[in-house]
Each structure stands twice: as structure tokens, then as C-alpha cells.
UniProtKB/Swiss-Prot annotation:
UniProt keyword terms in alphabetical order: Glycoprotein, Heme, Iron, Membrane, Metal-binding, Monooxygenase, Oxidoreductase, Transmembrane, Transmembrane helix
Sugar attachment sites: N6, N141, N270, N517
A GO CC term assigned to this protein in UniProt: membrane
Protein name: Cytochrome P450 monooxygenase 176
Subcellular location: Membrane
Family annotation (Gene3D superfamilies): Cytochrome P450 (1.10.630.10)
Job of this protein: Cytochrome P450 monooxygenase that is able to use delta(6)-protoilludene as a substrate to produce delta(6)-protoilludene-5-ol and an unidentified hydroxyprotoilludene. Is also able to use phenanthrene as a substrate for oxidation.
């Protein structure tokens, strides 16, 4: 027996020793904490081999049946806690907000794509608090929100007209509508067509960035050392795509901002979030470089976050009304009784239309726009229900699982607004989907009131003036669409067929009149 090992033997021995070392560390780390339950982990991979590439929220929801609503998993060396009930999410991210308000470090986005991270991706600190105050002043102030009503009403009129003229393109019209609303509010930019230069470019940019991977879960997020490797080395191919994404992202931030700065001081500029912030933070008409970067980023986030998710809820509404026409008829009867046939509903009618409010809640529940939310990060070790949650854990709110909680929502697959009728405030504390689809605690979406008003006005206006029905095939048979949603950060509705037409000649007249009406 030779005492001299060849190179292959040495590699095998070294590998075995390394695996033994990692396994020992893995076992000791697990023993140090009384972790929440979860699927069995293995050294090196953790649970990576058990997490699917697609529809992760559904897999995590299945795990709830076995492990409960707080699940611990480990992806390579990163600890994750999947939170799948409203109660647990509120206990952790709201009642213990001091510990749970941080964000994980989005390495790819923050170091390769964005000059500075947007507020939604920013870690907790003074700069985050400053930008949060900006949004609160523009999106959570009642008088400021009322100032956006003419924009909503003007664009609703254009949307109804487009739906009447070319109903088959309803998804494109809804997309244009939301983009137009947010561009006007963010920059004062008026959109006249779905081919608006900025909207088209922004759509391409967002698609490019989202194709890089999920929040804080790309290869370089797990292996930060890859940031130092040349682009040609294995595992570093993301750099080329990230460079292209950065160029596009910078341009997306610059195009509307440059246009607005050029127009400021002239009659061509419209009041907007950006003009307001420039006036607030400039000194003697001049902006510091840091302030300019923050204003551009904040306006970009307002557009990106406000247009895409709201569009999803609106297209989900069209799908739901196609599948459940009895819901539309019940809502139309309520609107006709309360509002009448001489005008379209306005936001002042909101409290008088309770069934419409139930429909909105059910839309949020039936297809939550961001199924896995945006992850939080636990700053320090914590203990919940007797379980240890290690500091640094990524806290993932499984919003989709919350919306499918059978203890809150019987028959979860069915679109049934009546489930929200007659519930008191205590019941709504956990059942109202607004309690979880907009985020939690200090990280709750500051644009939620604007988004909610936007969705309400869209639903009320379409139901009051339009009939949504099922399309027919060449043989005259009804085409019943399958409720199908794209896998991704945002749960977009898959394309489907339906019919949309004015309810009556009087409704058609109201649609024509609405294009010049800015009273919401």
C-alpha cells in the first residue's frame, strides 16, 4: 500500500475534509437555535433543491399544511423565514417593526443596475426615512390626493372611449391608462397614446431588469464574491445583462426628468411630484447632486410601482366579470340605484356602494398583485412562539398563501365578493386583503390610498357604462377563459378573450361626455 497520494486522491481527501467541516458547522448552527419547523435541510444546499423555479408561493403554501404558518428554510448559507398567515405577519413586521423593518441587501440591483437603490429596496436608515417623508407628503396627504382626482377622471374618460372603440385591445388600453395616470402625477407628463415614447421604453427597461432574477435571490446575491470576477468567467454572465439594464435604467430615470427641467419656468410644465420636490429641496433654485439623484429615483419608483401592480388588479377585474357575470349585474344594480343613469360614479360615491367595495376586496384576494411581497430583513435575533429566528434572516411574506387561508376564506378558488359582507372591524383586521397586499409595518406601500382610489374609480366607471361578457368561437360556443396568471414578481393575467360594449345608448353618451369631464 503506497503512502503517497496522487493529485486525484489529494483532491478527493481535501473535498471530503471540506464537506466534513461544512457538515459539522451546519449541524452545530442548527443545534444552536430552536428554529421554526421546515423541510429537512442538507449541507451546502440547505433547501435549495426543494424550492421550485416557478410558482414558489404555491409550494410554500402547501408546506403550511405540514409545518405551519412560520417556516424556516435555508438557501445555501442564507436563512429565510416564510410567513404565511396575516396574524404572524402582523405580529412580526408590524408589532415588532423595530426589528423587522430592514431590507436584505439587493446586491445585483444596488451595485450593478441602480445609481442608488430606490426607497423600496433601501435598507433602513436616515436616507430611507427622508424619502419616506417625501412620499408621505405626496401620497398620504388627503388634500394632495384630492388634487389628483382631475387626472384620474380625465384618463378614465379616455380609457372608456378607447374600450368602446376597440374593446379587443382592453389590456393595452388599461396599461396605457395606468401609465398615463402615474406619468402625470410623477412628472406632469401627458400621455396621448399607448405608443408614448417614455412608456414604451420604460416597459422594455422594467422587463430587462426583472429578467435578472427575483428580489435578493440572484446568483451574485448568494455568492457576493462573483462581483469581482471578470464577465467571461463561469457564473459571471449576469454582468453583461446587468450593464445593459443599468444603461436602460439610467435613461429611464433621465428622460422625463430632463424634459421637465427643460420646461420648468414655462407654461408647458404641469404641477407634479417632481416639480413639488424640486421646489422643496432646492436652494436658490439649485439642486445638490444627491438631491437630484433622489428625486429622479423617487419619481421613477412612483411610476414603476404605481402603474404595473394597479394594471394587474384592473385586468383581473375584467377576467372576474367575464367568469362571474352575476357579480357584475349585482354591482350594476347597486350603482344604478345609488348613482342613477344620468352620470358616472365619482369618488364621493364610495361610501354609498358597499357591494363595489366587496368586489375590490375580493379582487385583491383572488389575485394579489405581488404574491411573495417584498422581503424584509430581521436585524437581530428574535424569538416568536418559542422559536428562534436568527438575525439576518430574510422574512418573506407569502401574500398568496394569506389570500388562500381556509380559516379566513372558505372556498378560496371561487370569486365571491359576498364573503366580505356584514363583517365587523375585528373580522376585517385579518380578512381585509388591504391588510397584507400593500406590505407591512414601516414598509407598507405609501401609494396604497392612490392605488385604491384608482382601482375604485376604474371599477365603478366601467360597471356603470359597460357590459363585460364572454366571447364566442366560430361555432357560436361561449369561450370561458381559464383564470391563469403569469409566474413572476407581479402576477399578471394571461391574455384572454371577452366582449366589452356600452350598456345602452345613454351609457355611450356618458362615455362620450366623460372625455371632457375632470370631476372625480
Amino acid at each position: 500500500m503506497s503512502l503517497v497520494l496522487n493529485r486525484t486522491d489529494l483532491l478527493v481527501v481535501a473535498g471530503a475534509l471540506f464537506l466534513t467541516f461544512l457538515t459539522t458547522r451546519f449541524i452545530r448552527a442548527a443545534q444552536r437555535y430552536h428554529l421554526p419547523p421546515g423541510p429537512t435541510r442538507i449541507p451546502l444546499l440547505g433547501n435549495l433543491h426543494q424550492v421550485p423555479l416557478h410558482d414558489q408561493q404555491k409550494t410554500f403554501a402547501e408546506w403550511v399544511k405540514k409545518y405551519g404558518d412560520i417556516i424556516y428554510i435555508q438557501l445555501l448559507s442564507k436563512p429565510f423565514v416564510i410567513v404565511s398567515s396575516v396574524r404572524a405577519a402582523q405580529d412580526l413586521m408590524e408589532k415588532r417593526a423595530v426589528k423587522y423593518s430592514d431590507r436584505p441587501y439587493f446586491l445585483l440591483l444596488c451595485e450593478f443596475v441602480m445609481t442608488r437603490p430606490l426607497m423600496i429596496f433601501m435598507q433602513h436608515g436616515d436616507r430611507w426615512r427622508r424619502l419616506r417623508r417625501w412620499y408621505q407628503g405626496s401620497l398620504e396627504n388627503k388634500s394632495v390626493l384630492e388634487g389628483y382626482r382631475p387626472v384620474l377622471r380625465r384618463e378614465i374618460g379616455r380609457l372608456l372611449s378607447s374600450l368602446a372603440e376597440a374593446p379587443q385591445d382592453f389590456m393595452s388600453h388599461i396599461k396605457r391608462y395606468n401609465g398615463a395616470v402615474m406619468l402625470d402625477i410623477a412628472y406632469g407628463h401627458r400621455v396621448t397614446s399607448a405608443e408614448d415614447e417614455f412608456m414604451v421604453f420604460a416597459d422594455k427597461t422594467i422587463s430587462t431588469v426583472t429578467s435578472l432574477g427575483s428580489f435578493a435571490a440572484t446568483l451574485v446575491d448568494f455568492f457576493p464574491i462573483l462581483r469581482y470576477f471578470p464577465a467571461w468567467t463561469p457564473g459571471s454572465g449576469f454582468k453583461k445583462q446587468a450593464l445593459m439594464a443599468k444603461e436602460m435604467w439610467d435613461e429611464m430615470e433621465d428622460i422625463p426628468y430632463r424634459k421637465l427641467r427643460h420646461e420648468m419656468g414655462s407654461d408647458a410644465v404641469n404641477r407634479s411630484f417632481t416639480t413639488f420636490m424640486i421646489g422643496e429641496v432646492s436652494h436658490d433654485g439649485k439642486l445638490g447632486a444627491d438631491d437630484e439623484i433622489d428625486i429622479k429615483g423617487s419619481a421613477t419608483l412612483m411610476y414603476v410601482a404605481g402603474s404595473d401592480t394597479t394594471m394587474t388588479t384592473m385586468t383581473t377585474f375584467v377576467l372576474a366579470m367575464t367568469l362571474y357575470p352575476e357579480v357584475a349585474r349585482k354591482a350594476q344594480a347597486e350603482i344604478d340605484h345609488v348613482v342613477g343613469l344620468s352620470r358616472l360614479p365619482g369618488l364621493d360615491d364610495k361610501d354609498s356602494l358597499p357591494y363595489l367595495e366587496c368586489i375590490i376586496k375580493e379582487l385583491y384576494r383572488w389575485n394579489p398583485p405581488v404574491p411573495l411581497g417584498v422581503p424584509h430583513r430581521l436585524c437581530v435575533d428574535d424569538n416568536y412562539r418559542g422559536y428562534d429566528i436568527p438575525g439576518g434572516s430574510m422574512i418573506v411574506p407569502n401574500v398568496w398563501a394569506m389570500s388562500r387561508d381556509p380559516s379566513l376564506y372558505p372556498d378560496t378558488k371561487t370569486f365571491r365578493p359576498e364573503r366580505f359582507e356584514g363583517l365587523d372591524a375585528q373580522a376585517m383586521k385579518f380578512r381585509d386583503p388591504r391588510k397584507y397586499i400593500f406590505g407591512f409595518g414601516r414598509r407598507i406601500c405609501p401609494g396604497r390610498y392612490l392605488a385604491d382610489s384608482n382601482v375604485w374609480l376604474f371599477l365603478a366607471s366601467v360597471l356603470a357604462s359597460m357590459d363585460i361578457g364572454r366571447a364566442h368561437d366560430a361555432a357560436g360556443h361561449e369561450i370561458i377563459p381559464t383564470p391563469s396568471f403569469k409566474d413572476g414578481i407581479i402576477s399578471h393575467v394571461e391574455p384572454f378573450q371577452c366582449t366589452i360594449r356600452p350598456r345602452s345608448e345613454r351609457a355611450a353618451q356618458l362615455i362620450r361626455e366623460s372625455t371632457g369631464n375632470t370631476s372625480a
